[in-house]
């Protein structure tokens, strides 16, 4: 019996949710979400979780399953998602549908992650506290001194990536880059990847409109309810950081909306750049 994992990927707002629900219904599969933001609770508007009707039509996994206060890594996702996939195949599924736009999560499922040392929760909490007081630039500079290679390769504005790399350096006494072997981990199932794409102007228009819809649906109120947790890892992301700035009265709402739209477009471009290097993806215009 065949065991095929169909991964539907693509930039934010391209239409992955509708496409994946359709495929899941076709194959009698649940939808396994591969989204590093939708996995957190209490962030439904800003992460564009599937609608109530979509969630009712098909069973979804990894949607709002982790508390916003909990640190959750691509390594955690690899362990849980691969175990789930294996169990569902053992239950008789021949094709499973996975969908998302998180590059590191998808790569973790397809190729496995390098064997990094165990994390240190106390050290991680200390680094996040320092982030709030000193800013990401100070931590990035510390990473540069300990691991120039990783510093040159990652987005040093991404506080989560900087903190994870720095944590590994401090725990192990070795550069984060020294653990990256690039060896692929074998899987007991076939993987097929479908990438969804649209003309750039159409995609950007959809992104801009989605942000406006989020505001109408209550994004500001959602972010306000999360103010006590603003320093948590889950909230260091587009759509939340900008509204926090608005709630701090540092920028007007119109500017926050503009920044969310711009930063989301930049993220979509980064996603496409990453995946265009993968020859195994079959691209589909939607």
For each feature predicted by the language model, list its residue ranges.
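Phosphate/pyrophosphate-binding catalytic cores of soluble transferases and nucleic-acid-acting enzymes
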Residues: 1-286
């Amino acid at each position: 019996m065949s065991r095929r994992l169909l991964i539907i990927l693509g930039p934010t707002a391209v239409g992955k949710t509708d496409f994946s629900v359709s495929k899941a219904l076709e194959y009698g599969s649940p939808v396994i979400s591969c989204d590093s933001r939708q996995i957190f609770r209490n962030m439904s508007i800003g992460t564009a979780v599937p609608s109530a009707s979509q969630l009712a039509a098909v069973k979804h996994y990894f949607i709002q399953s982790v508390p916003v206060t909990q640190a959750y890594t691509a390594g955690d996702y690899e362990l849980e998602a691969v175990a789930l996939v294996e169990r569902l195949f053992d239950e008789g599924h021949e094709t499973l549908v996975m969908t998302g736009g998180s590059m590191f999560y998808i790569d973790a499922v397809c190729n496995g992650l390098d064997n990094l040392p165990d994390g240190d929760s106390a050290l991680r909490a200390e680094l996040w506290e320092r982030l709030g007081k000193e800013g990401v630039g100070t931590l990035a500079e510390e990473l540069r001194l300990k691991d120039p290679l990783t510093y040159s390769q990652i987005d040093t504005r991404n506080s989560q990536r900087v903190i994870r790399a720095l944590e590994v350096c401090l725990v192990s006494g070795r550069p984060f880059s020294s653990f990256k072997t690039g060896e692929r981990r074998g899987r007991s199932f076939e993987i097929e990847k479908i990438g969804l794409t649209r003309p750039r102007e159409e995609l950007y228009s959809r992104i801009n409109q989605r942000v406006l819809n989020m505001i109408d649906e209550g994004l500001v109120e959602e972010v306000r309810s999360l103010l006590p947790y603003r320093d948590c890892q889950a909230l260091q992301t587009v759509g939340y950081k900008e509204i926090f700035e608005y709630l701090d009265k540092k920028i007007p709402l119109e500017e926050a909306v503009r920044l969310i739209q711009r930063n989301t477009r930049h993220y979509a471009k980064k996603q496409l750049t990453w995946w265009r290097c993968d020859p195994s993806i079959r691209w589909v215009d939607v």
